[in-house]
């Protein structure tokens, strides 16, 4: 049995859940930084006298960086390793986030937010790859959704940090705290193993064999003496252009459109919601409380989706969550009271993030 087949035949155990948590924490810090901006906007705009257009640039420039970082991160991970890119990207966005706290003006803040985006964008796809390459195919969907759930935890962390620190110490404090994940890089380097398929493709077969042998021993399985490599392990990776050719073209188009809808609705609402509520006359603290409740609803959405993908399938779960999210979004927009906004906001958050998690399994 070749090395990759041995890896895939391992029973799900302590190692897989440990990897999920270790990679998930990196995802959490990523989401915390992304979520922090939505809470900072409410006070930053007033303190610096920024127009809605200027605040829009503070948000948008980060997404520009994320798009560039995602492309760069994926390609670089194939050259220098998933683990290396995962660690370096965390360092990049942690430093850039901390620098946002000392930005003297809007121009410098935009520069720092751009590099934050580059780091965040590079880390996200690599995190999914690391987990998916270690987890057996039969439970991969559930693990990817659970990994995505750390995104909700990250936004929850952002809401808590903003609630307790921004009213008391100002928006600078949130960015300083957002830079602390840089110290997590030592845990990444020590406890997260490099991707086995990557090691094989780079000719580092002995290292890949050693990792799988250790996992087999931990699982109480007989350890193979020889490191066999299947021919499939060294195949050329799928090129981007092939995604738009049969049989992938239709699926690629649909997944892109669905992803656009999920991300547009999520960021379009939750990034601006704190500022919109403040503009409606609510205090900063009350606003953060309302948004915090809505963010809490994301977590059961992920967990429900993680169960349903294995019960009724990924396609049915995704379709159901998207349909329910659309209904909730309509009533959320029609909400004429705080109660209506919070209730429909919670339900919308539940289904939106559940769909987000399922989409990542395709």
Where are these regions (language model features)?
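Transmembrane-helix signature of 12-pass secondary carriers
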Residues: 1-362
């Amino acid at each position: 049995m070749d090395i990759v087949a041995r890896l895939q035949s391992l029973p799900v155990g302590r190692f897989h859940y440990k990897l999920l948590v270790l990679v998930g924490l990196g995802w959490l810090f990523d989401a915390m930084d992304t979520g922090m901006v939505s809470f900072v906007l409410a006070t930053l705009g007033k303190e610096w006298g920024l127009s809605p257009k200027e605040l829009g640039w503070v948000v948008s420039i980060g997404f520009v960086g994320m798009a560039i970082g995602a492309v760069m991160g994926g390609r670089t991970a194939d050259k220098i390793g998933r683990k290396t890119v995962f660690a370096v990207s965390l360092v990049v966005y942690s430093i850039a986030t901390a620098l946002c706290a000392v930005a003297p003006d809007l121009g410098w803040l935009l520069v720092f937010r751009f590099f934050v985006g580059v780091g965040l964008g590079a880390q996200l796809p690599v995190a999914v790859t690391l987990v998916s390459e270690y987890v057996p195919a039969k439970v991969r969907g559930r693990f990817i959704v659970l990994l995505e759930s750390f995104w909700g935890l990250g936004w929850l962390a952002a809401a808590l940090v903003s609630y307790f620190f921004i009213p008391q110490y100002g928006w600078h404090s949130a960015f300083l705290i957002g830079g602390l994940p840089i110290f997590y890089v030592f845990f990444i380097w020590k406890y997260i193993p490099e991707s086995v398929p990557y090691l094989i493709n780079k000719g580092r077969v002995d290292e890949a064999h050693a990792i799988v042998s250790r996992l087999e021993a931990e699982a109480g399985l007989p350890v193979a003496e020889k490191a066999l490599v299947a021919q499939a392990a060294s195949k050329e990776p799928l090129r981007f252009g092939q995604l738009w050719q049969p049989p992938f073209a239709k699926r690629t188009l649909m997944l892109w459109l669905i992803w656009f809808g999920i991300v547009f609705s999520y960021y379009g609402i939750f990034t601006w919601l704190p500022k919109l509520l403040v503009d409606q006359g609510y205090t900063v603290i009350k606003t953060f409380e309302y948004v915090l409740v809505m963010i809490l609803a994301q977590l059961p959405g992920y967990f429900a989706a993680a169960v349903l993908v294995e019960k009724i399938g990924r396609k049915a779960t995704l379709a159901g969550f998207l349909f329910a999210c659309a209904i909730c979004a309509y009533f959320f927009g029609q909400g004429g009271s705080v109660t209506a906004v919070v209730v429909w906001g919670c339900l919308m958050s539940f289904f939106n993030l559940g769909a987000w998690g399922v989409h990542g399994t395709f």
